[in-house]
Amino acid sequence: MPKRTRFRKQHRGRMKGISYRGNHICFGRYALQALEPAWITSRQIEAGRRAMTRYARRGGKIWVRIFPDKPVTVRPTETRMGSGKGSPEYWVSVVKPGRILYEMGGVSETVARAAIKIAACKMPIRTQFIISG
């Protein structure tokens, strides 16, 4: 979540089209690319990162290419309609098809493929493993 934001609450918005930014490998050699649009929560991002780090152990470096900068509000349960918008409950990253989620470098392809596959299982969307070059 961001350190500070201009406004506490945001509109939900909609996810049209494909990702034109953040859709190329920049840092590592291997990457996980989204194939569907979705909101990915900060917990899902962290779970994927931890799974990759644990699998790769001391080898390699991991880059997380998405950041949860959108607050999602939730109303208390059994509350009547009206009386304003709910309070921010958690943070999400808006991901469109083509967006790179994670990158990995400094390891062999077999290790990277296995680590990224574990991270992909933590994601709520279909993804694909890609190699730069």
Curated annotation (Swiss-Prot):
Alphabetized Pfam families for the sequence: Ribosomal_L16
CDD domains (UniProt xref): Ribosomal_L16_L10e
Record's keyword terms, sorted: Chloroplast, Plastid, Ribonucleoprotein, Ribosomal protein
Subcellular location: Plastid, Chloroplast
Gene Ontology cellular-component terms listed: chloroplast; mitochondrial large ribosomal subunit
Keyword Plastid: yes
Keyword Nucleotidyltransferase: no
GO molecular function, one term: rRNA binding
Top-level taxonomic group: Eukaryota
Entries under NCBIfam families matching the protein: rplP_bact (TIGR01164)
Family assignment from sequence similarity: Belongs to the universal ribosomal protein uL16 family.
Record text on subunit structure and interactions: Part of the 50S ribosomal subunit.
Protein name (database record): Large ribosomal subunit protein uL16c
Annotated organism of origin: Liriodendron tulipifera
Taxon lineage: Eukaryota, Viridiplantae, Streptophyta, Embryophyta, Tracheophyta
